[in-house]
């Protein structure tokens, strides 16, 4: 299956992606590579794999909550480069 520009535009609109005109060709190429890979995976013969082989056997590895010693707010403030009103002050990383 190959996507065309119209399909890409519809997908971008539905997923609220803003694809710039100069990125359109590369994005379309990337989507088509992904779809080619999906087609390859769909074509694999998995009839010899038992259903119980698919699931991972994994035990719950969450540690129990234990109340213990902890640092006071004053001790934590000593380690922080910037601390204000009970919170760590960090550089802004997401612009709105």
From Swiss-Prot:
Family to which the UniProt record says this protein belongs: Belongs to the GatC family.
Alphabetized GO MF terms: asparaginyl-tRNA synthase (glutamine-hydrolyzing) activity; ATP binding; glutaminyl-tRNA synthase (glutamine-hydrolyzing) activity
Domain of life: Bacteria
Keywords in alphabetical order: ATP-binding, Ligase, Nucleotide-binding, Protein biosynthesis
HAMAP family found in the cross-reference section: GatC
Record NCBIfam families: gatC (TIGR00135)
Keyword Ligase found: yes
Gene Ontology biological process terms from the UniProt entry: glutaminyl-tRNAGln biosynthesis via transamidation; regulation of translational fidelity; translation
EC number: 6.3.5.-
Protein name: Aspartyl/glutamyl-tRNA(Asn/Gln) amidotransferase subunit C
Catalysed conversion reaction: L-glutamyl-tRNA(Gln) + L-glutamine + ATP + H2O = L-glutaminyl-tRNA(Gln) + L-glutamate + ADP + phosphate + H(+); L-aspartyl-tRNA(Asn) + L-glutamine + ATP + H2O = L-asparaginyl-tRNA(Asn) + L-glutamate + ADP + phosphate + 2 H(+)
Gene name for this UniProt entry: gatC
Assembly with partners or alone: Heterotrimer of A, B and C subunits.
Role summary: Allows the formation of correctly charged Asn-tRNA(Asn) or Gln-tRNA(Gln) through the transamidation of misacylated Asp-tRNA(Asn) or Glu-tRNA(Gln) in organisms which lack either or both of asparaginyl-tRNA or glutaminyl-tRNA synthetases. The reaction takes place in the presence of glutamine and ATP through an activated phospho-Asp-tRNA(Asn) or phospho-Glu-tRNA(Gln).
InterPro entries: Asp/Glu-ADT_sf_sub_c, GatC
Keyword check for DNA repair: no
């Amino acid at each position: 299956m190959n996507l065309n520009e119209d399909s890409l535009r519809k997908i971008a609109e539905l997923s609220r992606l803003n694809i710039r005109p100069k990125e359109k060709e590369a994005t379309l190429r990337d989507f088509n590579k992904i779809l080619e890979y999906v087609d390859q995976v769909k074509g694999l013969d998995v009839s010899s794999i038992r259903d119980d082989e698919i699931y991972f056997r994994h035990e719950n590895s969450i540690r129990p909550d234990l109340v213990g010693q902890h640092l006071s707010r004053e001790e934590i403030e000593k380690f922080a480069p910037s601390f204000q009103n009970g919170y760590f002050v960090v550089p802004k990383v997401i612009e709105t």
